Amino acid sequence: KVTGGTIKQYDNLKLYPQGIDVLIKSIQMHDDPVTESVYPARVGIAVKGAKPDEVGRGDVISAEDVVDVKTEIELDFKKSPFYKNDIAENQGCLVSVGLQIKAAKFLSISPLKLTFEKPIVCKKNDIAVILKPESTTIRILGSGKIL
């Protein structure tokens, strides 16, 4: 999915969070080959430079320095009014940003800071949803924009 800008055949881009250099060999839109695709578009791309086991759900292909790869983020957090439990420092959770879902821990509550076990790809103002899968009631703890 093209979420911003343009992607062209033979572009040299990077696969994040790994930072692998990739070459766009071909682009398909609705089963038809195209030479470029502009936001917003759903595309299929063939890349050179990355093996299938190096690519995972939520990985991002982008020009260099457009996205951030972070192991720690700060959020403008709004707790869900339906989530009744308290949150504490060092408590574990899952964080969803785009198609990525990564394990994290709370570093601080006010302001809300999270630290990740594995790096996450994000941009400023992306929405992060915080989940507690082991919760017996509601599993969505809240959300906020990445600062």
Question: Which residues does each PLM region occupy?
Answer:
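C-terminal effector/interaction modules appended to NTPase cores
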Residues: 1-147
